[in-house]
Regions:
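Bacterial N-terminal signal peptides that target proteins for export
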Residues: 3-16
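Structural signature of tandem-repeat unit edges
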Residues: 9-12, 48-58, 69-87, 97-110, ...
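Low-complexity, acidic Ser/Thr/Pro-rich repeat tracts that form intrinsically disordered stalk/linker regions
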Residues: 32-48
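A structural signal for leucine-rich repeat
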Residues: 285, 377-379
Length: 410
């Protein structure tokens, strides 16, 4: 009987121990998935709220459900538990093609890189409450082809729209940044390939537009930057191949138009830069095949290479008295140009500047003396003296006879 009781006691003890172990294991699993930070742990823990997941520091990092189970209308809350939501993390909702609408909270300060990129079903973003938003990261909404408009006018704290932030949003028709008075630069590729874009409102605070920022925005018909009184720079190819563009208004503050900035804008018919009194060099209008008239500022000292390359409809350009240099191929194949008047200040004309200008019949040099042509760009070879008294002969020299030479006034 004693042996039986002893055996029973051992079995009971084993059963109690096993039960305790199972309870401990179960409790541990529950705590691992808990949405609350554990007692005694000073570090914030990852937080889950419905389908949203955070890093414990206020940034949503993604979702816990299957992508297809995400709500089509996604409302990001200002708080999850006690955690204030201030950011959307890197690639948090990338490729979530089922999303159609997005509403973001007032607490938000940052939208991370690629946060909503390639959400092709997204048609609407409500940023009306986002008064604290300071940054939209690299590629944040790139490839959101269903998006038709973006109103950032309420985002008065916004200081940065990152590289490629809205690139390839081919359905986008309008963008309003007029209220974003803390933005100083549109970064490169920001609206690259937004071929449906017809209207852009930019803030007066703008100082620069990055390279390729609006490249390929083929539906854009006008760009008015005249109110951007602090704008100094338009980057290379910023409006390249915006072939629907017919009107451009630029401010007096502008000091630089980058190489190819308006290249291939085949709809542009006239260009008035006369008010750009801080501009000393010009480039960027090559391939503007419909351009007929150009007005240059009195401050201009240099026309860069390829500046008006193959602007074949150009019939009139008045060169300012301050001009000292004309770059290589600057007016190459401007076949509509019939006369050019070259100021006394001019000292250098580079190779091919007027080559192929088949309509050019008159070249009037204000100072006809001491002009020589060289074979080398560094003027190191023995030069040829030329006479420029006859305007027709001078035109022939420019377009054909000495078109491939480097001209210099000694």
């Amino acid at each position: 009987m004693k042996q039986s009781n002893s055996r029973w006691a051992v079995n009971l003890t084993a059963l109690v121990l096993a039960a305790g172990l199972l309870i401990g294991l179960f409790t541990g699993c529950f705590q691992l998935g808990s949405s609350k930070p554990q007692t005694g742990n000073s570090q914030p823990q990852p937080n889950e709220y419905g389908h949203l997941k955070t890093d414990g520091y206020g940034t949503i990092t993604g979702y816990t459900c299957a992508q297809t189970d995400l709500p089509k209308v996604l409302v990001i809350p200002a708080k999850i538990g006690e955690e204030v939501i201030t950011g959307i993390g890197w690639s948090a909702f990338k490729d979530c093609t089922s999303l159609t609408e997005l509403k973001l909270p007032a607490s938000l300060t940052k939208i991370g890189s690629s946060a909503f990129s390639d959400c092709t079903g997204l048609t609407s973003i409500d940023l009306s409450a986002c008064i604290n938003l300071t940054e939209i990261g690299y590629n944040a909404f790139s490839g959101c082809t269903g998006l038709t408009s973006i109103d950032l006018s309420a985002c008065t704290s916004l200081t940065q729209i990152g590289n490629s932030a809205f690139s390839s949003c081919t359905g986008l028709t309008s963008i309003d940044l007029s209220g974003c008075t803390s933005i100083t630069k549109i970064e490169k590729y920001a609206f690259y390939g937004c071929r449906g874009l017809t209207e852009v409102k930019l803030p007066a605070s703008l100082t620069g537009i990055g390279e390729l920022a609006f490249h390929g925005c083929t539906s854009l018909t006008s760009i008015d930057l005249s109110a951007c009184t602090s704008l100094t720079q338009i980057g290379g190819r910023a409006f390249f191949k915006c072939d629907g563009l017919t009107e451009v208004k630029l401010p007096a503050s502008l000091t630089e138009i980058g190489h190819g900035a308006f290249k291939g804008c085949t709809g542009l018919t006239s260009l008035d830069l006369s008010a750009c009194t801080s501009l000393t060099a010009i480039s960027g209008f090559s391939g503007c095949t419909s351009l007929t008239e150009v007005k240059l500022p009195a401050s201009l000292t240099q026309i860069d290479g390829n500046a008006f390359f193959k602007c074949e409809s150009l019939t009139e350009v008045k060169l300012p008295a301050s001009l000292t240099q004309i770059g290589g191929s600057a007016f190459f194949k401007c076949e509509g140009l019939t006369e050019v008047k070259l100021p006394a200040s001019l000292t250098k004309i580079s190779q091919g500047a007027f080559e192929g200008c088949t309509g050019l019949t008159s070249a009037v040099f204000a100072d006809k003396n001491d002009w020589k042509v060289y074979n080398n760009y560094d003027y190191s070879d023995i030069p040829t003296d030329i006479q420029l008294n006859n305007t027709a002969t001078a035109a022939w020299y420019l377009r054909e006879a000495y078109a491939d030479k480097y001209w210099k006034k000694n």
